[in-house]
């Protein structure tokens, strides 16, 4: 009897883990101002940037030099150069990824991501659709309360003096 109860319980658990709420929500691809073929993106981007920007990958924590960057300037999408974050809104979240408390309005788009079995808000470049990272509600309370947790490889930094880093 214990074995039968265990099998029923396990079966119920496995079926519930495969419910529609656990599946990645498929939304139609948006049309973006900058569009390229997969081959063009591969030729333009490093393998790491291609994985993150075009396949919604995640770089390893603490692997990006931009995480510790303290210079004044603008962070742009590594795919198309659209300005997405300003350095004056960057903060050290301790997570190992560059973090900001706000975006440059109109240049970042948001969607729902359920890939890990729970809902997260995903951030994309509004110009090319490149995956940037995710936004969470555990940022600095004295500002927006948001933490835009961004893959450094999805960004390029333009210092105030205009030279690309």
Q: Which residue stretches match the model-derived regions?
A:
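Short charge-dense sequence patches
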Residues: 25-32, 71-79
């Amino acid at each position: 009897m214990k074995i039968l109860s265990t099998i029923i319980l396990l079966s119920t658990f496995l079926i519930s883990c495969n419910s529609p709420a656990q599946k990645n929500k498929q939304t139609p691809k948006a049309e973006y101002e900058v569009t390229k073929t997969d081959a063009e993106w591969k030729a333009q981007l490093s393998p790491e940037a291609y994985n993150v920007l075009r396949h919604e990958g995640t770089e390893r924590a603490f692997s990006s030099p931009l995480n510790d960057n303290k210079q004044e300037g603008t962070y742009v999408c590594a795919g198309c150069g659209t300005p997405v974050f300003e350095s004056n809104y960057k903060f050290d979240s301790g997570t190992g990824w560059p973090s900001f408390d706000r975006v440059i309005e109109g240049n970042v788009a948001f969607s729902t991501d359920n890939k890990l079995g729970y809902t997260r808000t995903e951030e994309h470049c509004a110009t090319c659709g490149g995956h940037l990272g995710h936004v969470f509600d555990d940022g600095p309370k004295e500002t927006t309360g948001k933490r835009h947790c961004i893959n450094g490889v999805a960004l390029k930094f333009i210092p105030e003096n205009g030279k690309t880093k």
